[in-house]
Design a protein with these regions (language model features):
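Active-site-proximal helix-loop-helix substrate-binding element of RNase H-like nuclease domains
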Residues: 28-58, 63-180, 406-421
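Polymerase palm active-site segment centered on the conserved acidic dipeptide of motif C
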Residues: 220-249, 467-481, 554-607
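Catalytic phosphate/metal-binding cores of nucleic-acid and nucleotide-processing enzymes, i.e., regions
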Residues: 4, 9, 27, 163-169, ...
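Short, amphipathic alpha-helical "recognition" segments used to contact nucleic acids or chromatin
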Residues: 433-444
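Mixed-charge, glycine-rich, non-catalytic linkers/tails in nucleic-acid processing enzymes
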Residues: 129-248, 388-397
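Acidic, glycine-rich two-metal-ion catalytic cores of nucleic acid-processing enzymes
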Residues: 4-40, 190, 243-424, 483-546, ...
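Catalytic palm active-site di-aspartate
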Residues: 92, 152-156, 199-208, 212-213, ...
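Extended, well-ordered alpha-helical scaffold/bundle regions in very large, multi-domain proteins
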Residues: 189-295, 444-483
Length: 607
């Protein structure tokens, strides 16, 4: 439930919600403040009191306060649910209506739940509000709050949680709001990117462009493209949409009914009420894995075809895990190749008895066992240097601080600033921070416009920095351009073990600028897993460029490290790529209170 933190808003006069919200109902104000406090207590960029005040002040001046607050809160909710925060659900006509405070019958969240879940949540809404009406600050406003709650304006998180399981319209966040196209999102990255987008919106606002209109225009455009892609995909399979005279499409119910009479396709799902979903709800199979993981598609294909049979009895054959947000993902997937060259499948949030933190798995293995992680150190940088034969990337790999190295070679920092500690002035520290953001966005294929937004630089300076960075890594840029010319905007690269990586600039997954690197990293990890399983290691998680094993021998960490280094050396024909020291957790190092722990661990070690 979205909590209301009254510490910062004990009196209405302190809320800072003057025009245009001074005449708005109490419940709307309450919702705005609760959202602001919620994200304020969780987001690093709002920890500072002055930043917090500026944030509230800016939103007070814009009609889009509710929409933006909702957008951020929703993404947080999705992350907490284990749903990729790089996707934004529910951006369909109903949700747009809700964002605009529309309480028409068809816009009702209650009716949506009845339609898609087969459940009545009226009582849930009322119970939610009763919990909060006990607060002194809400006394005298109970009826008003109840009325607004029932019209879907406040406390949406528990309802979104219920809806998220079956209502799967998903849009790439990079298509909805101007973020980087294929950053390797963790939840922290998402919060940082979202804050940059808000700052960009502030700039738009100052230039006199209505933020709300601009936002809705981009959103509507992305929605239209998304739905057309979906209709084309479904028609290629089932021919279940028909073109109407006005140029729009509608479901062909006759075709759908015929399909339902036959054996139900395995990719069709049942709703909570037990009814079979129709074509418009099979997005679970089509778009559930539409997320910018560094090398998700080609790896899960390998997992399904090769690792699953080999690891039977070790990892239950379906436990592909990757860090995303504040928990681990567990995916069971049926990969397919669509017309847009995207690898996709079906994923679901599953229980893994190891996650409690933000950026690292916190595991409490059974007594007498160790959970050990080994990962490659700066894998992408090393692969850039070796595969593209770029001496600058190899120098960067050994420099100890990639961002200082880049800034020095770009002529933006003096040669003595070889590390963060050596950047002694505020100006030097700020420059390193800027180049860090700039380098990451550039390396993942962002264009000039996105680079400008991400690094908060004007266009002229952005173009200058981009040119300087490309000059530093001129050798790898040549190779990138050759690949781009040969394969165009969408294509497939096949690696030595026969598995492909597919990329699409249209959707901003793995782009042609980084596909060779991500794909080769996946290739290395595939071979490592194959050899580790053959050597008897019990692998229970893979996280991008890392493995987690469960063992009773603490020395297995060093053995796994050696196996990973030997494999990289053999496949790259180079000894550059290193493996960090094993991260070891014993029983009791982290407390895991979930009662399912013992049951789940048996999947890995037996009775």
């Amino acid at each position: 439930m979205i909590s209301i933190d009254f510490e910062y808003c004990s009196e209405p006069k302190d809320w800072g919600l003057d025009a245009p919200y001074k005449d708005k109902p109490y419940a709307v104000k309450l919702f705005c403040v609760s959202i602001c406090n919620e994200i304020g207590t969780r987001s690093w960029w709002l920890q500072d009191a002055d930043q917090r005040a500026d944030f509230i002040k800016w939103f007070d001046m814009n009609e889009t306060y509710l929409a933006h607050a909702y957008e951020i809160a929703e993404a947080k909710c999705l992350a907490q649910l284990g749903i990729d925060p790089g996707l934004v659900n529910f951006y369909d006509t109903w949700t747009i209506s809700m964002l605009l405070n529309d309480t028409r019958e068809e816009a009702s969240l209650v009716n949506m739940c009845k339609k898609f879940l087969g459940v009545n949540i009226d009582a849930d809404i009322k119970e939610l509000m009763r919990d909060h009406c006990i607060k002194d600050e809400t006394q005298g406003h109970e009826e008003e709050i109840m009325r607004y709650c029932e019209s879907d304006t406040v406390y949406l998180k528990p309802l979104l949680e219920k809806l998220a399981a079956v209502y799967n319209y998903r849009l790439s966040l990079s298509n909805c709001i101007a973020l980087g196209t294929s950053l390797d999102y963790t939840f922290t990255d998402f919060i940082e990117s979202t804050s940059n987008d808000i700052r960009a919106s502030m700039i738009i606002s100052k230039q006199g462009i209505p933020v709300n209109a601009e936002y809705m225009k981009r959103l509507q455009s992305a929605m239209t493209q998304f739905k057309m892609d979906y209709i084309q995909e479904m028609n290629s399979r089932f021919n279940c949409f028909k073109l109407k005279k006005d140029g729009t499409y509608s479901e062909d119910q006759a075709v759908i009914q015929e399909l339902l009479k036959k054996e139900v396709p395995s990719n069709w799902v049942k709703t909570a009420s037990g009814k079979l979903s129709t074509a418009s709800e099979t997005l679970k199979e089509l778009f559930d894995c539409h997320r910018p993981d560094k090398r998700f598609g080609e790896w899960l294909f390998y997992w399904k075809e090769k690792v699953q049979p080999a690891s039977k009895g070790i990892a239950d054959g379906s436990w592909l895990t990757s860090l995303r947000g504040d928990r681990m993902y567990v995916s069971t997937l049926q990969p397919l190749k669509s017309k847009t060259h995207r690898w996709q499948g079906r994923s679901k949030e599953g229980y893994v008895p190891l996650w409690t933190g933000w950026t690292r798995a916190a595991i409490d293995p059974p007594e007498g066992w160790y959970a050990i992680e080994c990962d490659y150190h700066s894998e992408e940088t090393a692969i850039y240097g070796v595969i593209f034969n770029d001496p600058k990337y190899l120098e960067q790999y050994r420099s100890g601080d990639a961002y200082c190295y880049n800034a020095i070679n770009m002529g933006l920092l003096p040669k003595e600033c070889v590390s963060k500690k050596k950047c002694v002035t505020l100006e030097q520290q700020n420059m390193r921070s800027t180049i860090k953001t700039f380098t990451l966005a550039w390396q993942y294929g962002c264009g000039v416009k996105k680079l400008s937004v991400m690094s908060k630089l004007d266009m002229d300076k952005t173009k200058d920095y981009k040119k300087r960075l490309e000059d530093v890594y001129s050798e790898s840029m040549k190779s990138k351009r050759i690949i781009g010319e040969q394969l165009g905007d969408n294509g497939t690269l096949v690696f030595p073990d026969g598995y492909p990586i597919c990329y699409s600039n249209q959707y901003g997954h793995t782009t042609k600028l980084n596909a060779p690197i991500q794909g080769f990293g996946a290739y290395i990890l595939r071979v490592v897993v194959q050899r580790a399983l053959k050597a008897g290691f019990k692998i229970f998680a893979t996280v991008h460029d890392a493995l987690w094993i469960l063992t009773q021998d603490i020395n297995d960490g060093q053995r796994l490290k050696q196996l990973m280094e030997d494999t990289a050396r053999e496949l790259l024909h180079d000894d550059t790529l290193e493996v960090g020291e094993p991260f070891i957790l014993a029983h009791g190092d982290h407390k895991c209170e979930d009662s399912e722990d013992t049951k789940i661990w048996k999947k890995y070690i037996g009775d």
